[in-house]
């Protein structure tokens, strides 16, 4: 019996060994079956990103579907962009860092998703959820952290700060009326906070590439990028024969080899190659025959057909938009006005807002009392208004002049070069909030005229032992 028991144990060990050898023989060559030490799975960094998507991104998507409409559509695009990033991170965990020339091509799927999200916002400026769309559009470039080194985390934070400018508007509009929007804001900002924590743990100084495996390229990484961001796949089966496109390319190479051989044979003739040239007589030389020069000028014209077609995307002229001045719901839309100094909005109500977009060299007067006014992407615009009960905002603009005839509690200036504000006697208690702007001046009425006061652009900060103290810097002339 003892001998029989020993024989059985030996057989079991032999079977186990054969099974392990069989598994090894079916593993694809190289390190494709092993990802950073995890056989048949994904790297810890990819697993952590999956958790971020399953929690924060999923929560944001759920809250966006509750709001529906443009917000839901936009959120689906964000989800798709995160899926593209997940595919890129999976590739980075399996391949070594690519050559510099291949980086742009590998990043293209993510950059296209970002562009799609930003384009959607631009096409829906009349949306009631425009602040929601803007918050996403301004911060979605944070997904470009994978190309930032040595500190991608602060880059994501900067993009997150850009989102808060618009999420604060959402909170201001809905915090007392519809808490669904408040939940939406929290879930969206949580994405970037968690992404910063993820980067700090797994990619502190920049995207971490695999130390083993082939070098990433557009060809070698195609299967990973096109596999989608689904659940981690099982261990791959034995690799099939090479794909047909490669065989076609090889066939083309074989077909072209005789022509290449003939070309090299001609080049190898050296000076003997000139023996095949035909002698040119004087009557065939253009510098001795004026009639040939005239013909030569004509014969060069067909080469113009080789110039890029005007239908190529790069040669499209900038699209000319039709000017707009209309009331849409409770929003006055003033868009794409140029060289107009007679724009007037006279029939206004307290709940109405005015949105002024991409107007140049124009003047607009708003009579009565409105809720708020936004000036966005305008140049050399003059605005005169009576009363605003909320806020006047100037964003991404240049050379703006604002004259307050009545009252306004707050004027906000952000990312603007050149803004001159003429206050009335009733508006002297107005608060001016500025960020990332220059050449700002407030003009105060005094003795029938205006006195100009510049808004500080330079500050000094010091530690007083318990907190930071910031005050305008005095620049001595």
Swiss-Prot record:
Domain of life: Eukaryota
SUPFAM superfamilies for this protein: C-terminal domain of adenylylcyclase associated protein, N-terminal domain of adenylylcyclase associated protein, CAP
Claim: Acetylation is one of the keywords in the record: yes
Biased composition (Low complexity): 301-320
Limits of the C-CAP/cofactor C-like domain: 317-455
Sequence segments annotated as region (Disordered): 224-261, 274-323
Gene Ontology terms: biological process: actin filament organization; cAMP-mediated signaling; cell morphogenesis
Membrane topology: Peripheral membrane protein
Residue ranges, compositional bias (Pro residues): 230-246
PTM-bearing positions, type N-acetylalanine: 2
SMART domains: CARP (SM00673)
Places the protein is found: Cell membrane
Keywords from the named record: Acetylation, Cell membrane, Membrane, Phosphoprotein
GO molecular function: actin binding; adenylate cyclase binding
PROSITE patterns: C_CAP_COFACTOR_C, CAP_1, CAP_2
Modified residues (Phosphoserine): 301, 309
Gene Ontology, cellular component aspect: cytoplasm; plasma membrane
PANTHER family found in the cross-reference section: ADENYLYL CYCLASE-ASSOCIATED PROTEIN, ADENYLYL CYCLASE-ASSOCIATED PROTEIN 2
Family assignment from sequence similarity: Belongs to the CAP family.
Function according to Swiss-Prot or TrEMBL: Involved in the regulation of actin polymerization.
Protein name: Adenylyl cyclase-associated protein 2
Protein's gene: CAP2
